[in-house]
Structures are given as structure tokens and as C-alpha cells.
Amino acid sequence: MNSKIRKILAGLFFVGITLLFLDFTGSIHAWLGWMASFQFLPAVLALNFGVVLLLVSLTLFMGRIYCSVICPLGVLQDIFGWFGKKAKKNRYTYSKPMNMLRYVMLGLLVVALVAGFTSLAALIAPYSAFGRIASNLLAPVYLWGNNLLAAWAESVDSYAFYSVDVWMKGGITLVVAIVTVVLLFVLAFKNGRTYCNTVCPVGTVLGFLSRYSHLKPVIEIGRAHV
């Protein structure tokens, strides 16, 4: 896929899914709710075979396009990685694949789902991880911004916005969200989507399928630029 097209699609999915987590009116869900149904693990758990088949087919044809376009956590890491590239002259360094860790995390997710340990499964699942980040860290800022607009609208006799209560979640959920975003930033800043390639169970499954993809990246040494 063309890099510019991929970035545009990734931006649309990232903004759309983020707004789904921040929306408190329900209006955005009416227009963009379909984006949530295209998340791989939720589709598997919901037995949405049509979506699963589509995502698998895309992977077999174009590689891990899901991780770089549709998954919000993958796109978030690309954003962090962009800052990393700007901050340092050197490109990403090669890291040996940690297959054992990947398969352990995948097995842990499967066991957690089968045993009914939903909290553990949610801790590992990428879509759930992004949801915690959006709900715990971004939602309060979004609501405060809404309330500022509501106050301004009221001052000019407009009711386009209305104030809502803002509350921050505390306890373990907030701590997990903070630790997750910090860890993702550090890993992506240094070496790109490390989480996707070593920890994420969805990345492990799609990475295996992408070995047989029709389109694969090819490095032409004669065209390399310094």
C-alpha cells in the first residue's frame, strides 16, 4: 500500500476510534460505530466470522495492514515512533525476534479467555489497552474542553454544547493506563512497534499469517539513499 494512503487511512481510523471512546452523546457511534467492529480480537470473541475472514484475507494479501492502519494501539506506536525518528539521526536497529515471549503471551491470552479470566485477557488485548488509555487519560481532557465550550456558548445564548460532570478514574485502572502509555512511548520511541512484535497476541497471529502474504516488502540495494 502506498505510504501516503496508509497514513491517511491510519489517521482516520485512529481519530474515529478515539472519538468512539470519548463520545458521551452517542451521536458519533451512529456514524463510526462500524470501526469498532473491525477490531480483530473483539471480532473473534463476538464470532463475527465475516470481519475475521476479511482481516485474515487482508493480511494474506497485504501483510500486517491491520496493525499499521486499523488497530489504534498500533497507530499510536507509529506516532510515538515518529517522534523518535525526529529526535535521533539513526534509524531503528535490528532486534532478534523474541518468539518465546510472543508465544507465551499468546498462550496466556488463550488460557485467560478459556478460563474466564477476562481482566487478565483485557490487560493483554491491544484494543482494551487503547481503551484504557483513551478512557482514563484522554476522556477527562476531552470533557473539560467540552465544558469550556459549553460555558462560552452559554455566554452568547447558544445551547450547542452542554456541561457534563468530569471525573477521573482512580486506582489500578488509572495506574495500568499510565504504565501502558509510558511503556509504549519508550519502546516505540527507541525502536518502533516493539510491543506489536513481541507482546501483542494479535500481532503474533497476524505476523505468522503475513509470512504467506502476497505482497511483501523488498529492499533494493541499488536504490538505497543516504
Model-derived regions, located:
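Non-ligating segments of multi-cofactor redox enzymes
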Residues: 1-223
